Amino acid sequence: MSAPIHENERIKARSNCLRGTLRESLADTLTGAISPEDTQISKFHGFYQQDHRDRRQARPEQYLEPYFGFMLRAPLPGGVCTPAQWLAIDGMGRELGGGSLRLTTRQSFQYHGILKRDIASVIRGINAVMIDSIGGCGDVNRNVLCNPNPVESALHREVYDWAKRISEHLLPRTRAYHEIWLDGEQVGGGEDVEPIYGRTYLPRKFKTAVGVPPHNDVDVYANDLGFAAVADGSRLIGFNVSAGGTGRNTGIPATFPRLADVLGFVEPERTLAVAEAVVTTQRHFGDRLDRTQARLKYTIERMGLDAFRDEVERRAGIRFAPARPIGFTDQGDRTAWVRGQDGRWHLTLYIESGRLIDGPGQSSMQGLREIARIHQGDFRITPNQNLIVARVPEPGKSEIEALARKYGLLDKGIALRLNGMSCVALPTCPLAMAEAERYYPDFLAQVERLTRKHGLAEQEIVTRMTGCPNGCARPYLAELALVGKGPGRYNLMLGGNGRRYRLNRLYRENLDEAAILAEIDTLLGRYAACRQPGERFGDYLIRDGIVRPVVNPAEDFHE
């Protein structure tokens, strides 16, 4: 007798390696939606069906179906793209992607509001410049993060190459994507084979990051799988491997955020074998009945870390060496020009909540379009939703900086903003309980007023906001975070550290804006008066006993 499984597992099994009935759904002109089963399969192709929640009430009154649109996400390993690719990305956003473009916390880009009839055109448009959307969503490995640090550029290039190789190695092998979206023909030669994923892929999504100490921009311990580079000078000698990090699910007490456990050290040549072994261990042992318990962290909690490590070693044919000493001492994007080891320059542009748009009072898409037309290097999306104009030769600096200033992409370097981010939330995310992206700028402005009041305007504080507990902006590592609870109400989370390897904890629940700001005002006043030299806000909150550190999240996160 077979074990019970979630309906999504049956949908994947009968999808014929992710084909489903997507062609039929796309051809159905009577609705702006795709079939319910295809909404699960479409995720593997990089897009989600959504509806515009600001229009939900009015549509039925007009005897209309919901205003359906699609969010399409395209992975860019390490967030790197060329100027030619950027111009194509921008063009698709302006023409078919709702007139905007969003940089994500996972160094990808995504469009919102694509109509069903335009999905194929968008996919073909980005494919023309060698970008695809397969694996942008779904129960597979998502975009692989890589530290965009331009200072240690020789080491960064080597680590970035490994991030690309991990990404390519863990891609689905099905031909369905090319058949449906690109050439329109089913390729002969027998059934697809998925050597890593199998017919039902993973129980849930899977996220991987590659970090370069001392900078933890990628939040390496907040990922299912993490590789922290270990270097001898500028030479990569291996990685400390970690597994089992991520956030939690909405309204389910049995779920909890968790930092990844360190499995040990491996040499670079073992990297792909270890990555595959962790993925296949999760494929085999992950929960396929309860999707709220299906992430890798819960698999490790059930198996125990030692048993999980043994299984990964067996599958990879390796033995982990003891983890090497490393230190994450920094995070956040650097402002101003930074010179790389190759003599070229890198400029980080501030993109509020990752949103690029042309409209009243802002023209960020146009500004980047003009920069891309003259830029000879590349662009790098950061895990903080900002954008690095990378590898600029000395003679090109002045023109690029002038364009950045003209279009308001510089001079926003207030410490609080550069260390903050938010998820999309309303009106497009179906899970959002409260505003995030649309409210975050106003919230930050009010917190900035409080930091100035207490003489803390130059103090970095990692601040994040999400519209629901799922935590797409990784709020559970922030020093100060708001997690949506309901319309206009948030849980106030406190106590992460500035280097992003300590979980925060619920401080106050279900607060409105006035109550949140009153709490922050009091806390900032205490911090300004009582902090020790060099002490960060989150560290002070722990030292002073305002919040207790989370030691074992499975047991004490909800206390």
Swiss-Prot record:
Keywords: 4Fe-4S, Amino-acid biosynthesis, Cysteine biosynthesis, Heme, Iron, Iron-sulfur, Metal-binding, NADP, Oxidoreductase. [4Fe-4S] cluster binds at residues 423, 429, 468, 472. Pathway: Sulfur metabolism; hydrogen sulfide biosynthesis; hydrogen sulfide from sulfite (NADPH route): step 1/1. Its EC number is 1.8.1.2. GO terms for molecular function: 4 iron, 4 sulfur cluster binding; heme binding; metal ion binding; NADP binding; sulfite reductase (ferredoxin) activity; sulfite reductase (NADPH) activity. One of its GO terms (biological process) is sulfate assimilation. PROSITE patterns: NIR_SIR. Gene3D superfamilies: Sulfite Reductase Hemoprotein, domain 1. NCBIfam families: CysI, PRK13504.1. Alpha(8)-beta(8). The alpha component is a flavoprotein, the beta component is a hemoprotein. Component of the sulfite reductase complex that catalyzes the 6-electron reduction of sulfite to sulfide. This is one of several activities required for the biosynthesis of L-cysteine from sulfate. This is Sulfite reductase [NADPH] hemoprotein beta-component. It comes from Thiocapsa roseopersicina.
